[in-house]
Amino acid sequence: MKMYEILELSNLYNSISNVKLPLKTSYKFARLMKLVEGELTFYQTKFREIIEEYGVKENGEYKLTPDGQSIMIIPGKESECNVKLFELRNLDVPIEGIKFSIEELEGIDISIQELACIMSLIED
C-alpha cells in the first residue's frame, strides 16, 4: 500500500467511524487503523520537515499562496520540494494480515475514490 492510500484510508475511517457496522467489520477497521497509526505519524513528521525546509515564513508564520490554499514555497525550490513531497506520498507501506470480503463492506456507503483506497485489502 502507498502512503497516499494510507492517508485516504484515514479519511475513509474518519467518515465511517460513527457508522454502526457488524462487529467483525468494525474490529477489522479498528485493527487496521491501529496498524497504520505509526505510518500516519511518520508522514506528518516528514511533511512538517519538508515544509520547514521549503516553506516561506513571514514574521514567524508560513506565508500562504495568493489563493490562500497552500503554503508558499521558496522561489526556485518548488520543483525540489514537489519531488520530496511526491516521494513521501508514494512510499510503500506494508500492511499485512487484514483483509475484507465484499460482504463485510456491504453496510458502508462509500465513493469510488474511497473504495479505491481499500481495494488492495479486499478479497474476492
Predicted features by range, described:
Residues 44-124:
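Low-complexity intrinsically disordered segments
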Residues 2-55:
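N-terminal interaction modules that seed assembly of large macromolecular complexes
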